[in-house]
Amino acid sequence: MHAWPDPSVPAVAGTPVPLKLFDTADQRVKEVDTTPDANGEVGMYVCGITPYDSTHLGHAATYLTFDLAQRQLLANGHKVHYVQNITDVDDPLFERAERDGVDWRELGTSQINLFRSDMEILSVIPPRDYIGAMESVDEVIAMVQQLLDAGAAYELDQGDIYASIDATEQFGYESNLDRATMEEYFAERGGDPDREGKRDPLDALVWRGHREGEPAWDSPFGPGRPGWHVECSAIATNRLGSHFAIQGGGSDLAFPHHEFSAAHAEAALKVERMAGHYVHAGMIALDGVKMSKSLGNLVFVHKLSEAGHDPSAIRLAVFAGHYREDRDFSDAILAEAEERLTRWREQLAGEVSEAEATEVVDKLRAILADDLNTPEALSLLDGAAGDCNQIIATALDGLLGVRI
């Protein structure tokens, strides 16, 4: 599946600073392991959308987080292999299509196209591999077979196959949650703890046997379709290898999704740890209230763009808060971002020596390399009034994706 056009990302002046990010598994900020893989690249996998509804600013903020991370790596001279999936076969998609009386494939295609447009508007660097679940069914089948062969999965009636949480000794290391919280989140976030016959309520579905009215693919263990978590396990490891630098997504994916996608890959491929970093972005609220379609308070990137808001201002509004925090979006925050952008553009005419400009860029690099500290980065640039020349402007484009 194709992604969206690449934005122009200029080279950045100054001295590279190793990127440090907060790792959910280790519960600390630590340096990203940028040891190149066999292809000389640093691997990053970010979970994509389930295309049953329009993506909103909360989704966009997550992808802006990992766009920032990739920009820091690129500015440091690393080659990045970025992979993102699309969960284009899943219950929410089928349910929404049935409710609206449309074909689930058509619904998925329409929402994927809208997402591509939003990402292009925001100058998000696209993944090299943009992979739908339907494209990767054979890869999922192979991984499910590996789990079965390893004794890490078992079959129940109706052709369903589940992976055992005790297949790896380290299950739970990624999210660091206690058992009670795992059970709560599992039930709330797509799990089926009450499924009769499961060895453990937390065992996750990796293959759903065929039901009438649902799409199905043939497999050695019967017709059916992939479970949610194993899709990402297969897509990521088939492109980035059994161990790679960063797995990312929203904070709501830490458990169960990232915990299980890591566990499935580790059990199937017999590796200790799938990703060096598990990185999670906070949620976005509108005027202090979590964005929800039922509340009618979703903010859409394409609507903001149609209303004449500069994409760079939208990025700055998101960057006003730290990526790991649950944070707010409002008309006032967007207006402040637009004022900031205007002010910076006026500063572009300021005369400053190359040495002075490079000093500002070095400070900006260091701040962003410290767990993508965008609030401090914006404060630094606000304080550089009159010090903005082309060297700094280019750094803003390369590191922040903000064009002045």
Curated annotation (Swiss-Prot):
Q: Where does L-cysteinyl-5'-AMP bind?
A: C47, G48, I49, T50, T62, N85, I86, T87, W228, G250, S251, D252, I284
- Name what cofactor the protein needs: Zn(2+)
Per the Swiss-Prot or TrEMBL annotation, the motif 'ERGGDP' region is positioned at 188-193
Q: What is its EC number?
A: 6.3.1.13
Give the matching CDD domains.
CysRS_core
What Pfam families has UniProt attached to this entry? Answer: tRNA-synt_1e
Spell out the GO cellular component terms annotated for this protein, sorted alphabetically and separated by semicolons.
cytosol
Give me any GO biological process, just one.
Answer: mycothiol biosynthetic process
Which positions does UniProt annotate for Zn(2+) binding? Answer: C47, C232, H257
Catalytic reaction list: 1D-myo-inositol 2-amino-2-deoxy-alpha-D-glucopyranoside + L-cysteine + ATP = 1D-myo-inositol 2-(L-cysteinylamino)-2-deoxy-alpha-D-glucopyranoside + AMP + diphosphate + H(+)
Short sequence motif 'KMSKS' region: positions: 290-294
Bridged cysteine pairs (disulfide): none
Q: Signal peptide location in the record?
A: none
Q: What class of enzyme is it?
A: ligase
- Any GO molecular function: cysteine-glucosaminylinositol ligase activity
- Binding note for cofactor: Binds 1 zinc ion per subunit.
InterPro entries recorded: Cys-tRNA/MSH_ligase, Mycothiol_ligase_MshC, Rossmann-like_a/b/a_fold, tRNA-synt_1_cat_dom, tRNAsynth_Ia_anticodon-bd
Which superkingdom, per the lineage? Bacteria
Motif 'HIGH' region residues?
Answer: 49-59
**Keywords, ordered alphabetically:** ATP-binding, Ligase, Metal-binding, Nucleotide-binding, Zinc
Q: Which family does it belong to?
A: Belongs to the class-I aminoacyl-tRNA synthetase family. MshC subfamily.
Q: Which PANTHER family match?
A: CYSTEINE--TRNA LIGASE, CYTOPLASMIC, CYSTEINYL-TRNA SYNTHETASE
- Give the multimer and partner information: Monomer.
Q: What does this protein do?
A: Catalyzes the ATP-dependent condensation of GlcN-Ins and L-cysteine to form L-Cys-GlcN-Ins.
The name this protein goes by in its record: L-cysteine:1D-myo-inositol 2-amino-2-deoxy-alpha-D-glucopyranoside ligase 1
Specify the species.
Corynebacterium urealyticum (strain ATCC 43042 / DSM 7109)
